[in-house]
Curated annotation (Swiss-Prot):
It comes from Drosophila melanogaster. This is Dynein light chain 2, cytoplasmic. Keywords: Cytoplasm, Cytoskeleton, Dynein, Microtubule, Motor protein. The gene is Cdlc2. SUPFAM superfamilies: DLC. PANTHER family: DYNEIN LIGHT CHAIN.
Length: 89
């Protein structure tokens, strides 16, 4: 199990879905080392579980300004890695 601490910075999402995002990201970080692969894993899992179209950005340093569907947005840190996950389109 991972010792990465989850810190949710901003969320417009149910508590259950937030926990799912953290769990999914934890799995992705254990499975992959490349940020693009981590993002792809999370995006595909959320597309499967909560229907398309999800978008995921993973990294240590990025700015963002996105439009998202209501109740389908989360921005959080898992250890040193920031994860932005949102549904749009």
């Amino acid at each position: 199990m991972s010792d990465r601490k989850a810190v949710i910075k901003n969320a417009d999402m149910s508590e259950e879905m937030q926990q799912d995002a953290v769990d999914c990201a934890t799995q992705a970080l254990e499975k992959y080392n490349i940020e693009k692969d981590i993002a792809a894993f999370i995006k595909k899992e959320f597309d499967k579980k909560y229907n398309p179209t999800w978008h995921c950005i993973v990294g240590r340093n990025f700015g963002s300004y996105v439009t998202h569907e209501t109740r389908h947005f989360i921005y959080f840190y898992l250890g040193q890695v920031a994860i932005l996950l949102f549904k749009s389109g």
